[in-house]
Amino acid sequence: MNNRPIPRNQASSSLGRNDLKPGLFGRSSFRVQHYSGTNGISPIGSSPRTKISPRYSFASSFATSESSLRESSYFDERPPVQDTGVPKSSGLYYSRASPKELSSIDRINDSSFNGIVCAGKTHLGLYKFSPQDKSIDCMHDFVSAGNDGNRGSNVQMGLGKRSKRTKLSTIADVKAGFHNHKNYVAICSNSTVLSIYDINKTGSIDNPLVTNCSQHVRSVNSFDFNMVQTNLIISGGQDSCIKIWDLRSSRSRTLSRADVNINTASDSIRDVKWMPHPTACRSASQNDLRSGVGGAAGYKFASIHDSGLLLKFDLRQPNQVEKRINAHSGPGLCLNWHPYQDYISTGGRDGKCCLWYVGDGKPGTDFLQAGNTSVNTPHSMTSNLPTNLSVVPDMTINCGFPVTKLKVRPCYEKNVLNSLVSMSSMAEDFGVSIYSLARKYIPKYNLSTSSASLGFVWWDDNLIFNIDKDNRINGWYLDREPTVLDNMPKIVTRWRDIEGNGLLFIDQDRGGYQVNDEVPANIEESKKPPNQRVSINSLSGTAGGGNSGGGSNSGMIGSIKKGISQTGLTSFAGERPALSKTGLNFSNKSLATQSMNNSHSNSFSSYAGAGPGPLNEVADYSGIESPFLMTIDLPYILNNMRVSQLPPERKSLYSPEVQAIRESPVKVFKFLAKELEFSYMQEGRSGEMKNATQLSNVNEDTTKKDLMVKFGISEKSTWTALVNKKNEAVEAISKKSVSTKEGSESLIESDGESSAKSHESDDNSSDADKKENAKDGTMHVQEKIDILLELIPICGHNASVYSYIDDLPNFKIWILIRDSLLWDLERLSVEYPDEKLPETQSTDQIGQPITMGNDDSLASDTRSYMTSDLNYFVEEHPRALRSDSDEPKDHKKPLSGLKSQLTKIQETEASIDDSLNPPKMLKKPDNPIKQEQIGSRLNDDSDSAVLEDDDNEEKSDFDTQIKGIPITNKRQPRQSFIDTYMGGLKSPIGSSNANNEFFMGRVGHSLGHSSPGSKGSPMASLNNGEFTYPGFKRMSSRNDRRSSGSLFLSPLKRRESSTAEFFNKSPMRPLSPVAPVSSFKSNPTEFLPPWNTRRLLKQIFKQAVEMGNILLVVNILFLFQNLYQLTSTEVLKNTLAQFIKILHKHELFELSAAILKCSPWEVVINADGGQSLVPIFCDKCGKLITNEPSKEKFTLEAQEKGNSMPLQRFGYWYCDSCKKPNTLCVFCERPIKTLAIGLLECGHEGHFQCLQSWFLDEGMAECPGGCMNQIRL
């Protein structure tokens, strides 16, 4: 920039009268009248500044030199900037880390000095930036040690002797003065005192403090300097009072009484601003035509309140409110006047930035074209009413975050839509966003820093400074910063909403941020008259403070009027600049859509002209169209095709409850977050699963033995013993197979004896360490099996939750995960040795269906169930052990084929062992049976695991483990998932149950899409009503154990279909087992199946991250991270921390607490509560308790003594100002030193423990203070 700094002795000078030529401020046809030479005397008699300098510079800092500015009469019109590509250099030009905490920033309004002022809790610094060196240097700190501005005023304020370092309040932002008072800066020394500093007094003997303004009884939230009457400063705070101070009336260091008091009769004031002076942006003739009076920029001001109310006042009539606008649905946080137009921008906690027209007349530019014919509207017919509320803003920008700081770029534009509005929020991951009013959906610039922005200020129309939470000062040149459109990709395709119903594409024509003023368009008429002046009595109450100060207000207002008449600013007649008559360019299509939307967030205001005339000539306007969004509802069409094929009773997919949930994505998110299971861990789990031998006690052993005797099961039950018992049961019916059975029994017994002998010899040769390792491995496998048995019902439950809201993609994902877990469970059970099963297995795992004949009269509860292997959970039930009742009697086959199959297997043993058991691939097992199992399994893999005999009998997977168990019947062909899904869905219980409404229920709707089971699977026997899944009896028993300590008690579990019913009724057909892991040691990736659980979970996790499915991401990480190691621990902790923040935003605090409680990972949450302040006021003197002197005193004492005992006497239960303690406990009459106190209805306070002892332990019902107040407990 060419604004070069000047020497120290010339720092107080500014542009003289001769230097202030019309061309300095003129632009286009707007000519500035000369300052009157006779009225050049300043009304400020003792003010240190006597010259007036402009607040903003309108020329580019690099395009025009200072001399050319003074010689030229007009500014050149700059055409709209055309985007030519992404700029190569970044706009970040200045960056400096401050050693002290920063909270606010403002510019020094002196064009000859490149300075900004920054304030923090212990810092008020003057900074100078150099464009040549790209540096920012701190010139002086006004509150550092030895430069305490309050050291001479502490006695007058009654605060006693303070410490060397002053603590400033960070509630309100620092502000700098204008023109004659441009060397003044204002900051709150504490929450209720406004302090004025002189930045020219930087010497060691100078006191920079000018005065203190202290009349507010509660915190000051905002203050502002007047641009015209520079000696006036306005302030507003929590006491809902607006106070105006005249710095000329300060005869001492303290102003204890404001010159003007206005009680707004509303809630607390968040922000208050003077109307800025137009600084010669229009001619005097236009102003006179508009208002007919002199300039009113020094009189008007506005305030915004906690209720979202925007009030506009005129100082000449302080008892009346000119405009009263309900600006926001929630608290309004900030406001900012447009520098050159009659508009106010407001920001609120509702995440909206609204633009309001607040002029007295009609706007020169309409957002929606208004015709010349005046139409009576409800607003136009209420001119005589005391109030006139503005309902619809002229422009609304939905930001998505609370707008805490808001400023309009100080640059004049003919069209107000070309103005830039910058805003920021103190929330995390937010910098400074700059929007163009011409394009409110996409910001023009996003100025991001390493941490959240705390404040910013425009130095000129191109340079903006901001500070962040890392205490860094950053400066940005916007002409070097790429726009958001430059970095936005054109090729983007997304699902339209959470239902996945349609696709979104973006228009390839990006457009720009400027409004085209050339092409007019016909817009339908929409009128809105100006708001009328509102009496202060029309508010919620009459202003007490305003009336009380009426006597002094009249003299003050007269002085202000007299001072304004002497400033020579009478040539700047008119209140605000008139807008150009050149029309805006809105298209019919974009405005037709907007005209139908009457919402608060997507609306424009329009005004009707009074009639023909120079000011009422309104042209056609047009704006920038939004990008075209084209949708393809292909999933919707396919879904309708699927619904049309369903039975009539199933076409009513959504119940009223589901429709209520699907109304908004927020309700869907809350429902899923509450219903889904996020963890299988609970309290006491580690103690319950220490090892396999501690899973049961003596009572369980006794129950097990009793049931084994009842069902006729021996204690050493094996698969071979089951075959023998089966053959013995069949012996009475099939007498022809006696010899075959005896041969098979002798063969199996001989093999069993040989295997037992070899196993005994191996055990004798092994040492104790080998036995211990085998035992540990068995226990480790058992623990994995137990975890899988916990995860499988959770996956089923999550699938049912997604099916309840008809979210089919996520439903299929959880069904796929469930089937992969079943595959893992099958692998573990295959590797689990039968002889090493824990003796404490639950008895409902031991059961085998033995059904003779085809008698349908037999009840299912009288049948016997036998098994001794965990394969029963997932394996297909062998046909050799199944009842023949499920097949016609004509197709029954005798068991004589057993001997031939066993003989055939024995003949191939030698070749299998020689060819498939090389030394490098496999170790020699402990017994020949295990070696034979491995060899046969590898043979199955190489030869497609199918051995067909002459009868087309298919060998089962059991024959890879236990030699001598045939599969006699061929499986029926399986039905694919698509066939089941698109065809008629049948009940999993069977067609015989006509009254079954399993698929008509909420959860049943999801289960109908489960993968079907084949007739060879154990679940297929459910359809015939002859078999119940005993393996899931164990799951249901575990669910009972989990229900007491479960993470979330889902409401779906209390409905008709529970999780156990889901698995009892779901037609599952798990995948076939593969070879053990030991057989893949040569090349693991070559034999890794596509349904491998870890690979599948990683793919699902990656897809969920890309699609932004946070619930699925957290579910997968929480459930499967410890078992499958899907990602790093750092990524897991960051994901969990972000998910906790999302839950807090949706007010799901109980759910987030439960997740943190059951999380096995330590998650550090940067809670926003660390930024909260709890102000404590003294009960005696009413002042804010800070106790900084006593804190430093006790700290020094602790350092001298070398221990922390003196610090225990420090607290906030006493006041350093009045030297008195706060209210004592009503029970023990001791100071209350903690924030956890009990407050009774009568007003007495006490320790929580004392009141608990009085009311609960002693059973008292009266106040312990003796006031006879009855406490109702």
UniProtKB/Swiss-Prot annotation:
GO terms for biological process: positive regulation of macroautophagy; positive regulation of TORC1 signaling. Residues 1-20, 69-93, 521-559, 741-777, 839-861, 880-971 are annotated as: Disordered. WD repeats lie at residues 119-164, 166-207, 215-255, 327-366, 448-486, 639-679, 784-824, 1058-1101. The keyword Ribosomal protein does not apply. It comes from the Eukaryota. Residues 754-777, 880-890 have a biased composition (Basic and acidic residues). One of its GO terms (cellular component) is GATOR2 complex. A zinc finger (RING-type) spans 1225-1267. Residues 542-553 have a biased composition (Gly residues). Residues 1-16, 839-848, 898-909 have a biased composition (Polar residues). Keywords: Metal-binding, Repeat, Vacuole, WD repeat, Zinc, Zinc-finger. Residues 941-954 have a biased composition (Acidic residues). Its main location: other. Coiled coil: none annotated. GO terms for molecular function: zinc ion binding. InterPro entries: WD40/YVTN_repeat-like_dom_sf (IPR015943), WD40_repeat_CS (IPR019775), WD40_repeat_dom_sf (IPR036322), WD40_rpt (IPR001680), WDR24 (IPR037590), WDR59_RTC1-like_RING_Znf (IPR049566), Znf_RING (IPR001841). It is found in: Vacuole. May be involved in a process influencing telomere capping. Belongs to the WD repeat RTC1 family. This is Restriction of telomere capping protein 1. It comes from Zygosaccharomyces rouxii (strain ATCC 2623 / CBS 732 / NBRC 1130 / NCYC 568 / NRRL Y-229). The gene is RTC1.
